[in-house]
Amino acid sequence: MTVQPQAAPAATRAGGTLGKRILAFAGHPLFRGDAQVVHGRNPYRRMLVPGSLAESDFDRPPGPGEWAAHRSLAAHRLLGTYYEAETVLLPEQGLDGLYEDFDLFYGRDLKELREGSVSDLERFAFGCLDEAVDVSGAATPEVLEAYFQHVVEEAAAGPSPALTAIANARDRRSAADLYLVQLALDGLTEASAMSRNLAGAYGPEQSALFKIFIDEFGYGVYDAKHTTIFAKMLRSRAMATHVHAYWNFYLAGPLATNNYYYYLSRDHAKFFRYAGAVTYAEAVFAPAFVEMIKVFRGIFGDAVDLHYCDEHAHIDEHHGRITRDQVLLALAGRHGPRVVPELLRGIAEARLVGGWFEDDTAAQIRWSDDLPRYRELAGSARTGSEPPERVALTAESPFGTRSHDGDVVLEVERGEADLVTTPTGPPERLAHGEALLIPGGRLYGIRPATPETACLLHAVPPA
């Protein structure tokens, strides 16, 4: 490939007031990252890649088909950080040496930036759902029950795209680990969003939801808590178990899925929507974990601890019945047809967002598992007339991951670079002059393999 003229640093396009607040938040020292690929045992620091945020237009929300766009990834990283600042995060080893970070993360300055932008950022990140989901038409408890049964049967009948991609991968172990990382988003802080819907007074449905919550927390026994048994599964794969160790590898779809339940739980005007969403989620979890057990046993045999999956394959059948009968249908019966559209919308949105999780994870697995082919595709890609973006790296450069809205060709202009696309798989070494096509929406990071490394990012115009 011919090296095109070098571009100046990307102009700031973050947009108006929202963009300025986002850049101020992401530019805080807590969120600038370090040179390590895996984050340390500090829940307050996570890489928000402030340099790439400046390229995103936060005046242009992603449409229904743009959930994997870079600005969607950036928005959901921010939202996830905002939401977690409303929970209690303490490192397992204690706060010694981290008191200052604790104070900064929960302190007034970042809190004011969050509170001044969270509603606008939610509209930016989730506004596309209004366009993508239509719940017009008859809205009765009977319609609600029939629609719910239909989508649950649909989910149970079809194989998981992500688990299918794992089973078909050349490097199935790395693919399986990538999937575990996406589950860790919720698995290590499980039921945190649900906890925001437990206060108040709303009758037997409140008690039914609390039954599920206390199950997730092991009825007060820490060793039985679902986050504890999820960590056992990670340890059996020799993976880190602290919160957000693999922050750099969370994909836009899984981030959006996790954030969606916080989004609904933060605004109690959306309570009935939450009730629909959580009922759908609980109903489809059990068959999904049955499929996961089959795939993971086929790869790892008895070397992987699947207690977490066994537990969910069993308990979520029970939770599915509770939420369907004692939450979803009970709320519709008690409060009448007027709440049914919101219950329906919650089911439909949860189904859609869950599809983002599956499709994004499957696409990342397929791409990262077939990088030699994307070396070949780089050679035939037609890049645009715009000068490429130049990225210079040294051993001290902070490591972060990002994606692009459209396809780009990554070319090594100086030195050598390691392309990192999975949390545990080997990186793809690119020598001077070599190139690789990165499809739009695919997550990657670059590590220098020589004292000084420079890469060029050539945009590929849509066909």
Where are these regions (language model features)?
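Non-heme di-metal
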Residues: 2-394, 399-413, 418-462
